[in-house]
Amino acid sequence: MIDLTGKTSLITGASGGIGGAIARLLHKLGSHVIISGSNEEKLKSLGNVLKDNYTIEICNLANKEECSNLISKAPKLDILVCNAGITSDTLAIRMKDEDFDKVIDINLKANFILNREAIKKMMQNRYGRIINISSIVGISGNPGQANYCASKAGLIGMTKSLSYEVATRGITVNAVAPGFIKSDMTDKLNEKQREAIVQKIPLGTYGMPEDVANAVAFLASDQASYITGQTIHVNGGMLMV
C-alpha cells in the first residue's frame, strides 16, 4: 500500500483533467498537495473536493521568475509533478517562430526551471521524487505538432540527464508518457475520429486520467525507490517501446 503521509507534493497544471486526478490521488494517499495552475476558479473547485491538507499557488509558467518562486515558496517539497503544458498545432511550413518558442518555453524550459529549483531544495534533505509528464508523441512524433513533440521528447532527455546528476542524493527523476487519455479534447472528436484512434489501441479504449495518476503515485512512492531515469508509458499498448 502506498503511503505518502507526511510528504508534500507540488503538482503543476492541477486545474486540468490529468493534473486534477494526480492531485486527488496523492492527497488520498496522505500527501499535503500544493496545487498550481493559472486558472484560479478551477483550482478552488479542486480545493473544495480535497477539503483539507492542500495549498493553492497561482503560477504563470511563461514567467521564469514565477517558476522559481513557486518552488521557493514551498516550505517543504518531497514530490514534484510537472504536468502543465500547452499546444499550438499546425504544420511546420505554417508554424511561426513564436508558436514554436512558446510551446518550448512552457513545456520544456519552465519544467527545467522547476526541476532545477526543486533539486536544490530536495538535496538539502537527500530525498525527492520528480515526475515529468511527457507524452506518447515525444517518442512517436505526430504531424502538425513539431513544437509539442520536440518539447515532450526534450522532457524525456532532460529526465534521463537529471536522474544521473542527482542519483547519489536520494532523488529519483522519472517521466510518465500518456497516450490518448479521455479529456475535454478527446470529447470534441467526432465518432469517426474516435473510432480511428481506438482501433490503434490494443486495449481497445481511451485511458482515463486516473490511469496516469496511478503511475505517478507509484513513482512518487518508496516502492519505486530503485527506479530512476525511466519513462513509464500509459497508452494501452498503442506504442510499445
Swiss-Prot record:
Gene3D superfamilies: NAD(P)-binding Rossmann-like Domain. The gene is fabG. The keyword NADP applies. Its EC number is 1.1.1.100. This is 3-oxoacyl-[acyl-carrier-protein] reductase FabG. The active site is at Y148 (proton acceptor). It holds the Pfam family adh_short_C2. SMART domains: PKS_KR. It catalyses: a (3R)-hydroxyacyl-[ACP] + NADP(+) = a 3-oxoacyl-[ACP] + NADPH + H(+). One of its GO terms (biological process) is fatty acid elongation. The keyword Lipid biosynthesis applies. Keywords: Fatty acid biosynthesis, Fatty acid metabolism, Lipid biosynthesis, Lipid metabolism, NADP, Oxidoreductase.
